[in-house]
Amino acid sequence: MTNTKTLEENISFEEALKELEEIVKKIDNGQESLETAVNSFERGILLKNHCEKKLKEARLKIEKITKLADSTGVLEETEV
């Protein structure tokens, strides 16, 4: 886990969510130092934002696919 101010764009939704869940468990556990907990919280915010971005992208893609399929009845691979 890195505590940088940015998040690698290539991290998958599933990886980010798993790391976020681990951070929540550690913070809830209460065994981390204050500084470590704050750094973990900061990383958690980055991961949450990344997950929200990935979900939004997926939703928009699904909406696009649905509109194309509804309007034409045919969906070409190049349209997606």
Swiss-Prot record:
Catalyzed reactions: Exonucleolytic cleavage in either 5'- to 3'- or 3'- to 5'-direction to yield nucleoside 5'-phosphates
Biological-process GO terms, alphabetical: DNA catabolic process
Gene3D superfamilies associated with the record: Exonuclease VII, small subunit
Family: Belongs to the XseB family.
Subunit structure: Heterooligomer composed of large and small subunits.
Name this protein carries in UniProt: Exodeoxyribonuclease 7 small subunit
InterPro entries recorded: Exonuc_VII_S, Exonuc_VII_ssu_sf
Originating gene: xseB
Major place of residence: cytoplasm
A Gene Ontology molecular function term of the record: exodeoxyribonuclease VII activity
Cell compartments where the protein resides: Cytoplasm
Record keywords: Cytoplasm, Exonuclease, Hydrolase, Nuclease
Function noted in UniProt: Bidirectionally degrades single-stranded DNA into large acid-insoluble oligonucleotides, which are then degraded further into small acid-soluble oligonucleotides.
Highest taxon of the lineage: Bacteria
E.C. number: 3.1.11.6
A cellular component term, taken from the record's GO annotations: exodeoxyribonuclease VII complex
Residues of the signal peptide: none
Enzyme class: hydrolase
